[in-house]
Amino acid sequence: AKEAKGDWLLYLDSDERIPVKLAREIQNTVADPKHQAYTISRYEVFLGKHLDHWGDPRVLRLIKKTALKRWEGKLHEQPKITGTVGDLRHQMVHLSHKNIDEKVPNTLKWSKMEAKMLLDAKHPPMAGWRFIRIMLTEFWYRAVRQGLWKDGTEGWIEIIYQMFSKFLTYERLWEAQRKPSLSET
C-alpha cells in the first residue's frame, strides 16, 4: 500500500475480475466519495458455472489510502480501516476453481494453515463425535442455509468439497494434538 501512487487502493485476488460497469462505478465513487472504504459483492463462478446460491459475499476492497491502518489475518487477510464503509452496487467476478486439479492443492495448503491456527488458539481436543458434528454443520450451512443444492451438480460438488475441506483441517488438527505425534513414532 505504501508504494501505491494514488489516493485509493483497490485490492484484488488473482482470480477476480472487474467488469466495465464496476470499473465505472469505482471511478465515479473515488471522484466523489461518501465513505473511506467500500465493499464489493462477488459474482461466484465455480467449475465454469455461476453459483446463484453462494450468497452475497461482500469483501472490503476499495479503500482510501489514508484510511488503511493495517492488515489482519494469516489466511484471509482483511484490511482494518478508520472511517465509514459503503457498498458498491456492481459485482466483481470471482473465477473460482475451473477443475478439481486446481482446487485440491490449495485446500491441502490452506488446511495446514487453518489447523495450525486452531492449534495455536487451543482448540478443544478432537474426538470422533466432533468430526461428525463439523461435517454435518458444514453440510447444513452449504446445502440448507445457502441452498447450494439448487445450483445443480456444481452446487452438490461444492457442498461435498467444503465438507471435505473442513474434514482435512480438523484431521490435521487431530494429528497435531496427538501425543506423541505420529512423526515421532
Regions found by a protein language model. Name each.
Residues L182-T185:
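N-proximal low-complexity "stem/linker" segments adjacent to membrane-targeting elements
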Residues A1-K2, W8, P19-P180:
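Catalytic-site signature of metal-activated, phosphate-bearing donor transferases
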Residues E16:
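Aromatic, loop-rich ligand-recognition surfaces of beta-strand-rich domains
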